[in-house]
Amino acid sequence: MKSKYFLAPISQRAAGGGIAADQTGGEWASEGERKSKYVSRRENSVIKDAYVSMHEWMYMLHQAGWHRRSLLFIMKQTISSCPCILSARGRGFSFGFPRAERFLIYFITKKKGEQDNDSRDKDPLLNPGTLKPLTAQELGAVFCDELVKQELDNEDRYIEIPKKIRDFYKMYRPSPLVRAYCLEEKLQTPAKIYYKFEGNNTSGSHKLNSAIAQAFYAKDQGLKGVTTETGAGQWGTALSMACSYLDLDCIVFMVKCSYEQKPFRREVMRTYGASVTPSPSDTTEVGRKILAEHPGTTGSLGCAISEAVEVATGREGYRYVLGSVLNQVVLHQSIIGLETKTAMDKYDIRPDIIIGCAGGGSNLGGLISPFMGEKLRGEADYQFIAVEPASCPSLTRGVYAYDFCDTGMVCPLAKMYTLGSGFIPSPNHAGGLRYHGMSPVLSQLYHDGFMEARAVEQTAVFAAAEQFARVEGILPAPESSHAIKVAIDEAMKCKETGEEKTILFGLTGTGYFDMVAYEKYHNGQMTDYIPSDEDLQAGFAGLPRVPEAL
């Protein structure tokens, strides 16, 4: 049988309709034979608020004269990467993104609460001066009011995404979930490899998901502007675009080594109206202090955070916003995992292994959020792998303790895996992963054994990036390539054992502004730096002493 697709009448569309489908059967992709066959679909369903579905593209191409065999080849190659996310709404289905975001911290506190009958956060953020739990009022001097509420919220499972943010998301969401057929064929592995691609927006990464949310709450509060840090530049780019969209002032402190390595990234930020300063700088008190103590330093995310916070707290009408680490950012990034899980559930795909790069932890936390919720509730079991650079091994070689979130020791203290706030990592090319700590949420999950971590060297990372780019046609960011490296490793294990595991990883962004790094790799000028035990002990020596009983 054949499927008929037609556009809903204009009047119906204006009333909220979208693509109507008379779907009575047909053929869908058969993985065994690698032939495409449509499966039976819901009959006479009206798809509201729809993006153009893969099936409509197929119909339009067929109408344009494409041969059926060619169309089947296109569907075989693309059906698993169909960017349409399905969710139940009434009788039909909606193609779009989730209307609410999920709190990963909710499931952790609920799990811990079941064990000791107390759902309160056992490891709250601490005031850097008093070492006592921070209040909402104290956090409000640094962050926007609504973001403070989100940061301290351990009770809500979901929050509604404001309409203004949803409208912005329509520019680039939902993002594609892609079956890496060509990579599988190249590796000759029985494993199935999928990646969630977040690079299809102007920032080139997942960072825009949280940037627009934080900028929206700042604008809604009536603020003049925001300050922030950025490593490789994706977060700064995302925030500068979001602020431009909402007419907010944007002040960015960019880690010095990335500022010098990625001049075009900073020009993108300036194009969107942001001011960009290399960090550490002589424009702030904390920057001057760091320069005096570490002459010639190339900076770190911790340094840039300190400078951004100093400026935000010293200017009326400004607040600090951040690109990773804290609960509020992981919350905004949960849209990645919610879209992914909805799409995989729709096509009866269950990942065995879920992999993500980890610097501060927001993209990984967002990707695993709905899957981890199932694991914590005992409903399913997944293998989660966080991948970090060997030059900044927060999880694999760090300690689980309270530490400052920034180098200048002006930010709240968080219970996390850390190398010490004074640790300055080597100037590797994954600027977005050069952070001394890790998300408190992910740290808790790792500490409790729900997630594993691996550290990889950057030459091996770029070898994997090149291999991926040559067969999949996307030039990955250095940060994303850490996940690619481990995904390939796991696929090769399947080749050895014959296991047909399903591997999912987060492709967080593109690397088109990282060509200096690729050039050094191709010219054999890239080196691997692994901190010695002495280097790490020096960082641990600066950890604050926090009373066990708060």
Placement of each model-derived feature along the sequence:
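Short glycine/serine/threonine-rich phosphate/pyrophosphate-binding segments
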Residues: G204, L208-I212, T228-L246, E260-P263, ...
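Cysteine-centered motifs
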Residues: C82-C84
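A short, small-residue-rich loop immediately preceding and capping a beta-strand
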Residues: S210, A218-C257, R350-L364, F384-I385, ...
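Active-site nucleophile and cofactor-binding loops and adjacent substrate-binding regions
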Residues: F197-S210, V226-G236, L326-V329, I355-G360, ...
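Residue-level detector of structural "landmarks"
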Residues: A20-D22, E27-G32
